[in-house]
Amino acid sequence: MEVSMTKKSISDTLRRTCLILAGSFIMAVNLKSFVRTGGLIPGGFNGLTRLIQEISVLLWHWEPPFSVINFILNAIPAVISFKFIGKKFTGYSCLMIVVSGILTDIVPSFPVTEDVLLISIFGGLINALAISLCLFANATSGGTDFIAIFLSEKYGIDSWNYIFAGNVVILGIAGALFGWDKALYSIIFQYTSTQVLHILYKRYQKQTLIIVTKRPEDVYEAIAEITNHDATLIKGEGCYSKQECDVLYSVVGRDEVNKVVNTVRKTDPQAFVNMIRTENLAGRFYQRPND
């Protein structure tokens, strides 16, 4: 048993590390080949780091290393994350911050296009991919991602759009200093990234399931085993058939929906499942903690 658990732990560590290294490399290439080429200021602490670099060049004609500024900015959020979110979570996040920062300083630039609109759109897509790989490893890319995860853990909300609103402030400062055209393109970059991230990463999104079934106990056991969520049993009657039926009502994480629905269909092939996106939720809802 211990050997099995050790193998599982090693496998999980390798998986998370590989995801973070891949995400770090993609983020560094994106920053050098898209963001810098287009003169964009991305959101979050990466954007704040770029803003500080640009201000330093403007005032002193010297560009400080990306990694050094980024490490300093992430110090306090990392401490907060360590205390309130999770130790391993913070450790892997710091690995992402360190590796992506160093790679950004040493990876050469490979400009793909000079079209700023294309850079804004595809750079945003690539940025979302890099962050998603990190989130799939149960970590973050640092900065505002720490804040987003903290808000999601504490209040159970999908906070990425709120973070986007905060990033607009950073972009507003960049626009006032360096011109509004690049700031507006940067907003396109950040909006694209936020919306794609919202699609790829579903941990903090909720889905309501309404299941009409002839095997309510078996279906409920499947829901409870997969999600650790409860369900409400409602007695109903078919309007056309006039036959009595059982209706299960449950709210689960959106990332759990496919597994739940597939299991329900195996348990009761005749089950009718309605999936409804849940915008807001008040009350107790179990959320798997970050480690």
Model region roles, listed by residue range:
Residues E2, K32, W60, E153, ...:
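Positively charged, small/polar-rich N-terminal and surface patches that mediate targeting and assembly
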Residues E2-K214:
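Core subunits and conserved enzymes of cellular information-processing
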